[in-house]
Amino acid sequence: MKQESASQSTPPPSLSPAPSSAQPSWGDGDPQALWIFGYGSLVWKPDFAYSDSRVGFVRGYSRRFWQGDTFHRGSDKMPGRVVTLLEDREGCTWGVAYQVRGEQVNEALKYLNVREAVLGGYDTKEVTFYPQDTPDQPLTALAYVATPQNPGYLGPAPEEVIATQILACRGFSGHNLEYLLRLADFMQLCGPQAQDEHLEAIVDAVGTLLPCSYLPEQPLALT
């Protein structure tokens, strides 16, 4: 059985961190703009209007399937497993940052408050986001993070146990397995520099448990 490690998501070796003189900015200098970092379902299903989006990563965090979900990908009787961010000095988590401007800001935050906070149990946190194409120009972004203090938090478990739980759960947004595989699909599209050993181990465990392949109805594509 694979031992859990907080630093399984390795930083991309080909991308160096921003020099100390580079200060993250909130909306490319626009005081009415905001970046929102998604690392779970937001990477393929933001469902809010935005002006720009960039693929990239945040340092100092690892992604873990440690948050329980009783609405989107599970139920009260059978909570699904969705991701949160774990503070990890050596960690690196890939995702998508969306820029919202003007009226989009309030609309996006109102929508995400229900989707992520009320229904998901997530709190907001400020993170530094490094765009894949311009890692020397970091951005300050808002991320939704589930902490151990929220009632839906499930915490660590062996990847095989997490995989079994994911295979059994479904919520109002669909099957928990779809969530897992779409996230894995996104990571493959990011390229070989994007690694997440925790995610990969769960996908491998699902492949062992599942007798046939499961494919999402609509393939994911980065635009």
Swiss-Prot record:
Reactions listed under catalytic activity: glutathione = L-cysteinylglycine + 5-oxo-L-proline
Active site: E116
Amino-acid positions noted as binding substrate in the UniProt annotation, renumbered to this chain: I36, F37, G38, Y39, G40, S41
Enzyme Commission code: 4.3.2.7
Start and end residues of each stretch annotated as Disordered: 1-26
Keyword Cytoplasm: yes
Sequence intervals crossing the membrane: none
GO molecular function: glutathione specific gamma-glutamylcyclotransferase activity; Notch binding
Keyword Repeat included in the entry's annotation: no
GO biological processes: glutathione catabolic process; intrinsic apoptotic signaling pathway in response to endoplasmic reticulum stress; negative regulation of Notch signaling pathway; negative regulation of protein processing; neurogenesis; Notch signaling pathway; response to caloric restriction; response to unfolded protein
Location, primary (coarse class): cytoplasm
InterPro entries documented for this protein: ChaC (IPR006840), GGCT-like (IPR013024), GGCT-like_sf (IPR036568)
Tissue: Widely expressed, with high expression in forebrain and anterior spinal cord. Expressed at intermediate level in the dorsal aorta and heart. Present throughout adult brain (at protein level).
SUPFAM superfamilies: Gamma-glutamyl cyclotransferase-like (SSF110857)
EC category: lyase
Keywords: Apoptosis, Cytoplasm, Golgi apparatus, Lyase, Neurogenesis, Notch signaling pathway, Unfolded protein response
Cellular component terms per the entry's GO annotation: cytosol; trans-Golgi network
Localization terms from the record: Cytoplasm, Cytosol; Golgi apparatus, trans-Golgi network
Subunit structure: Interacts with NOTCH1 (via extracellular region).
Record family assignment: Belongs to the gamma-glutamylcyclotransferase family. ChaC subfamily.
Function: Catalyzes the cleavage of glutathione into 5-oxo-L-proline and a Cys-Gly dipeptide. Acts specifically on glutathione, but not on other gamma-glutamyl peptides. Glutathione depletion is an important factor for apoptosis initiation and execution. Acts as a pro-apoptotic component of the unfolded protein response pathway by mediating the pro-apoptotic effects of the ATF4-ATF3-DDIT3/CHOP cascade.
Protein name, per record: Glutathione-specific gamma-glutamylcyclotransferase 1
Organism: Mus musculus (Mouse)
Gene: Chac1
